Amino acid sequence: MRAYLDLLQRVVDEGVPKGDRTGTGTLSVFGHQMRFDLRAGFPLVTTKKVHTRSVFGELLWFLRGDTNVKWLQDRGITIWDEWADEQGDLGPVYGYQWRSWPTPDGRHVDQIAQVVEQIRDSPDSRRHVVSAWNVADIPDMALAPCHTMFQFYVAPPGPGEESGPGRLSCQLYQRSADVFLGVPFNIASYALLTHMVAQVTGLEVGDFVHTLGDAHLYSNHLDQARLQLTREPRPLPRLVLDSSVTELDAFDLEHIAVEGYDPHPGIKAPIAV
């Protein structure tokens, strides 16, 4: 995970002071890209402990099309509580856009089902894209999408693998990236999604490419970032998915595990709401 530490170091060294919606203040850089070979291990930050149950549960919640925090809370996951209303609702956020994008004629598009079908039927298509950035719905969202759009790419088998399956890669564009708290979650979440989609489409995994727009450290995360930068990365863990799961909607928390995760201790930091 040296790529993540390089990002952290870049923001500390080159970030410019900027105000922000929360009033906290940030150091910010614009435009950064990281690439992770998913065959080399599961890209889970090791220089601090990441709460994997929250990462995995949040992704499953998105894939359910859910926009109420109750499902998360029932599983001990509270990462969205600060933005929910009294009924636990968040408005038409990620899950709604992924699974039920509204059309002008009153229909809804299940982008996730559509992209899985496209990967199976037309792997060479350049339209394997899912977007959460629905301009018309943003005013009704508790929080505008930070990770806005992702695209899958199917590469043919490499040299010596002519008879094997292709490799599935994913690129995420993230318009707003909380480098200390959010980005480690985002990397692991989309790496997991790539593994899951690869499994249900009969492919191997390739790369996860993470492209960031405004990559920032909040002013009250700077000491924590500097502490993290003193730590040496440890070997990446291995992701284990239950091989009996053949449809994306069938995945549950019990089907997802990591082996060999040996991180440095966690580093607490306040979340900017």
UniProtKB/Swiss-Prot annotation:
Catalytic function, reaction form: dUMP + (6R)-5,10-methylene-5,6,7,8-tetrahydrofolate = 7,8-dihydrofolate + dTMP
Keywords: Cytoplasm, Methyltransferase, Nucleotide biosynthesis, Transferase
PROSITE patterns named among the record's database cross-references: THYMIDYLATE_SYNTHASE (PS00091)
Highest taxon in the source lineage: Bacteria
GO term, biological process aspect, one: dTTP biosynthetic process
Assigned EC number: 2.1.1.45
Active site: 146
CDD domains the UniProt entry points to: TS_Pyrimidine_HMase
Matches recorded under Pfam families: Thymidylat_synt
Subunit composition and interactions: Homodimer.
Family: Belongs to the thymidylate synthase family. Bacterial-type ThyA subfamily.
Protein's name in the database: Thymidylate synthase
Source species: Nocardioides sp. (strain ATCC BAA-499 / JS614)
Name of the encoding gene: thyA
